[in-house]
Amino acid sequence: MSTTLIRGGRIVDPSQNIDRVGNLFLRNDRIEGIDTGATVADHVIDAAGMIVCPGLIDLHVSLREPGDEKDETIESGTAAALAGGMTSVACMPDTSPVVDNRAAAEFVQLQCARAGYCNVFPLGAVTKNHDGQELAEIGQLVEGGAVGFTDAKSPVANAEIMRRALEYTRMFGRPIFNHPQVPELTAKGIMHEGYYSMLLGLRGIPAGAEVIMVARDIALAEMTGGHIHLMTLSTAGAVDQIRRAKAKGLRVTSEVTPHHLALTDAALQNYETNFKVDPPLRTKEHIDALIEGLRDGTIDVISSDHQPFAEEKKQNELDSAPAGVVGLETLLPICIKTLIETGHLTWSKLIAKLTINPATILGIQKGTLKSGHDADITIIDPVTSWRIDPSKFKSKGRNTPFAGWEVKGRAHTVIVAGRVRHHA
C-alpha cells in the first residue's frame, strides 16, 4: 500500500466544478479525495503555486507503430505524451497494417502495455484499409478494445458508408471521428485558398471543403442518431453549423488544434514545410471563430493532432512534403499562450477541454478527481518561461512550427495510476 499527498496546489477539476487551493490524497492507484484531512503520506508533493488537475487526455494522436517506426514508436510517442502532461491518449488507426481488425487493436494495446508510459486507447478503422469502400469489423474491434472509429486523415467520402457506420457504431455506444474534408476539393492542395495562396502561387484548399463535409456529417448524425466527432476544425463555417446542430440536441462533438489557433496562412510565405498541415492554416477571421467556438462550448476539445515525420520527409519541397506537425509536447504551452494569457478561456474551461470532455467523448472513466477514480494527475507549472527546442523532444518527430518560441507553463509532474511517471 502506498499513499501520496499533493499539498497546497490550486485544484482545478471541471467535472466537479472545483477550483480552489487544497490538498489531494491518493491511495495506491486511486484518488482518495480532496481535503480529506490527511497530513502525512508515504510521498508528499509540494504543489504550491501550481495547478493540480485530472490527467490530460489527447484524443487525436498518431503513434505510427506498426509500420512507420522511423517516424515514431509507441514508446517514443507515449514518452512525448507524458512530457506534455498527457496521462491518456487515443491513437489513430493509420498504421501499416491499418487497425481494422481485432488482432491489430490487441497488438497496439500489447505494445502500449510494454512501453508503460501512459494509457493508450486504440481507435479502430471505419473502413477496411481506410479505402472507404467496405466497413471494417466494427464488432470485433470493439471486442479488441476500440473506443471509437475513424479513417484518420482519409475522410469517409461515401455518404452511404458513413450512414451505415453511424448506425452500427451507435449500437456499441462508440463515436465516429471524421476528418471533415471533401477529397475532390482538397486534392493536391497545399494551403488555405485565399490571398497568400495566390501570392505564393500555391494550390489552395477552400474553406468550403470543410464546411460541406461538416454539413453532410451533421445531417447523417441527425438521420441515424449516431455520434459524429468532427476532427481538427479550421473554419468559421464549420463552427456555425456545429453550433446550430448542438442547439438541436444532435450528437455532434468537435475539436481544434493549438496550431490552428496560433498560426495563420501567412506563415507559409517562407515555404517552410513545418507550416504545412491538414487542414491548412487559415486566416485570422477563422481563428477568431474557432476561439469563440471554444468560449461558448461549440468546440468540445483541444487535441494535438500529433503527426510525427522523419526529418528527411519534411525536407522535401513544399508540394511533396507530408502535411502535419508534432504537438504532444507543445499543446499545453501553446494553449496557455493563445487562450489563457489572452483571457479567452479560464483555466477551468481550458482544463475541461483537455480532461473531462475528451474522456466523455471516448466513454472512458478518466478526466476527473472524484474519489475512487484512477489516480491520473497532471501538475502544471503555469509561470515558468522556456524556449521550445525540438532537439529536446521525447518524440522522434522534430517537425514543429513552434521552434524557438518563448512560452510559459509546462507539465511539472505527471502521475499515472498513482505513480510519478514524469517530473520536469
Q: Model-predicted segments: where are they?
A:
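C-terminal cap of metal-dependent C-N hydrolases
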Residues: 317-320, 374-424
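Metal-associated gating/positioning segment near the N- to mid-region
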Residues: 48-115
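N-terminal metal-binding scaffold of metallo-dependent hydrolase/deaminase domains
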Residues: 1-39
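His/Asp/Glu-enriched, well-ordered alpha-helical/loop segment
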Residues: 199-227, 274, 295-296, 300-302, ...
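Histidine/acidic residue-rich metal-binding segments in metalloenzymes
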Residues: 133-302
